[in-house]
């Protein structure tokens, strides 16, 4: 069904030491605000639109950008967090507070590619034939009982972890409440998000 997506591991060897943020933007204003936030906390070593090709069955696409980043040493030290927790909290904060911006991939030397489309169309749209990976995960439809939107397609990712699954997480609300006690925020309208965190 609709809601296809892929995650490729090993696709950015030239930036293997940097976090690769893949971001959906609904508006230019959201992009500008998100970039200001990224620049406050990270050194951006490269940024670009993620290459795509027009596809007749992929529509209503957001702006899709990628940023290769490293935490600013002063910000990381002031946070008193380890690097991975610093990045995870930043991603969750942006996704929770910045309307119109969604960081859907944030790992090192890997990236998620997803859309409102069938998997074969999503692969063509993102020109995945141009990427070389040592491992891929993929999924073919939106999670059960969730609304269809670009960010809601599998796989779900945080840092280097990606999750795809079939079925429903029956204890979603209990899991959501538990992880929210640790500062994680569930904003993606799906039970799968809990597993990723």
What are the functions of these language-model segments?
Residues 1-197:
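Conserved short alpha-helical segments that host acidic/polar catalytic motifs at enzyme active sites
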């Amino acid at each position: 069904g609709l809601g296809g997506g892929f995650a490729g591991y090993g696709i950015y060897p030239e930036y293997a030491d940097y976090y690769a943020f893949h971001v959906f933007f609904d508006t230019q204003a959201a992009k500008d605000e998100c970039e200001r936030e990224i620049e406050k906390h990270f050194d951006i070593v490269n940024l670009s639109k993620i290459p795509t090709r027009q596809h007749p069955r992929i529509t209503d696409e957001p702006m899709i950008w990628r940023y290769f980043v490293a935490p600013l040493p002063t910000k990381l030290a002031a946070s008193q967090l380890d690097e991975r927790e610093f990045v995870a909290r930043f991603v969750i904060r942006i996704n929770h507070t910045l309307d119109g911006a969604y960081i859907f991939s944030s790992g090192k030397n890997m990236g998620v590619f997803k859309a409102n489309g069938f998997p074969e169309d999503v692969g063509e749209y993102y020109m995945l034939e141009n990427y070389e990976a040592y491992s891929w995960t993929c999924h073919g439809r939106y999670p059960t009982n969730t609304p269809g939107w670009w960010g809601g397609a599998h796989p779900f990712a945080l840092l280097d972890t990606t999750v795809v699954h079939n079925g429903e997480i029956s204890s979603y609300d209990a899991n959501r409440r538990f992880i929210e006690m640790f500062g994680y925020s569930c904003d993606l309208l799906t039970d799968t998000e809990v597993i990723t965190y």
